[in-house]
Amino acid sequence: MGQKPSKPKAPPTTYESPRSSLTPDATGFGPEFCKSCWFERKGLIKCQNHYLCMTCLTLLLTVSNRCPVCKYPLPTKLRLEKSPTAPPPEATNPPPYSP
């Protein structure tokens, strides 16, 4: 008695994050390292104003969805800086098998 009917809850808003860039090799950036482990320079992902390596990003996403460095949401969608390439197909057939 005396209780007001509950209001229907609004659906949760989804945060549409833009894709973060994945840099395969950051040696051309100068002294850019992963801000979490300070070791990796390859496979860096841009997170706001710093970079994280894939290993640290994966580990951090298992704990929280916020970056411990900048407090912004961690990137979950990636955009490749360079398209992946494959070696050219061989023009000749491999030698026949001989035991």
UniProtKB/Swiss-Prot annotation:
Modification(s) after translation: Myristoylation is required for the role of RING finger protein Z in assembly and budding.
Superkingdom field: Viruses
> Which residue stretches does the UniProt record annotate as biased composition, category Pro residues?
85-99
Give the motif span (PPXY motif). 94-97
- In this UniProt entry, which residues carry a covalently attached lipid of the kind N-myristoyl glycine? G2
Q: Which GO terms describe its biological process?
A: viral budding from plasma membrane; viral budding via host ESCRT complex
Query: Where are the annotated segments for Disordered?
Result: 1-27, 79-99
Q: Which InterPro entries match?
A: RING_finger_Z_arenaviridae, Z_RING-type_Znf_sf, Z_RING_Znf
> What GO molecular-function term can you cite, just one?
zinc ion binding
UniProt keyword list = Host cell membrane, Host cytoplasm, Host membrane, Host-virus interaction, Lipoprotein, Membrane, Metal-binding, Myristate, Viral budding, Viral budding via the host ESCRT complexes, Viral release from host cell, Virion, Zinc, Zinc-finger
> Where are stretches of biased composition, namely Polar residues?
14-24
What membrane topology is annotated for this entry? Lipid-anchor
Q: Where in the cell is it found?
A: Virion; Host cytoplasm, Host perinuclear region; Host cell membrane
One of the record's GO cellular component terms: host cell perinuclear region of cytoplasm
Q: Where is this motif: PTAP/PSAP motif?
A: 84-87
Q: Name one Pfam family in it.
A: zf-P11
> Residue ranges of the RING-type zinc fingers?
34-70
Query: What is written about domains in the entry's comments?
Result: Late-budding domains (L domains) are short sequence motifs essential for viral particle budding. They recruit proteins of the host ESCRT machinery (Endosomal Sorting Complex Required for Transport) or ESCRT-associated proteins.
Per the record, the similarity remark reads: Belongs to the arenaviridae Z protein family.
Please give the function described in this protein's UniProt entry: Plays a crucial role in virion assembly and budding. Expressed late in the virus life cycle, it acts as an inhibitor of viral transcription and RNA synthesis by interacting with the viral polymerase L. Presumably recruits the NP encapsidated genome to cellular membranes at budding sites via direct interaction with NP. Plays critical roles in the final steps of viral release by interacting with host TSG101, a member of the vacuolar protein-sorting pathway and using other cellular host proteins involved in vesicle formation pathway.
Subunit (UniProt): Interacts with protein NP; this interaction probably directs the encapsidated genome to budding sites. Interacts (via RING domain) with polymerase L; this interaction inhibits viral transcription and replication, Z partially blocks the product exit tunnel for the releasing nascent RNA product. Interacts with the glycoprotein complex; this interaction plays a role in virion budding. Interacts with host eIF4E; this interaction results in eIF4E reduced affinity for its substrate, the 5'-m7 G cap structure.
Q: What is this protein called?
A: RING finger protein Z
Q: Which organism is it from?
A: Mobala mammarenavirus (isolate Rat/Central African Republic/Acar 3080/1983) (MOBV)
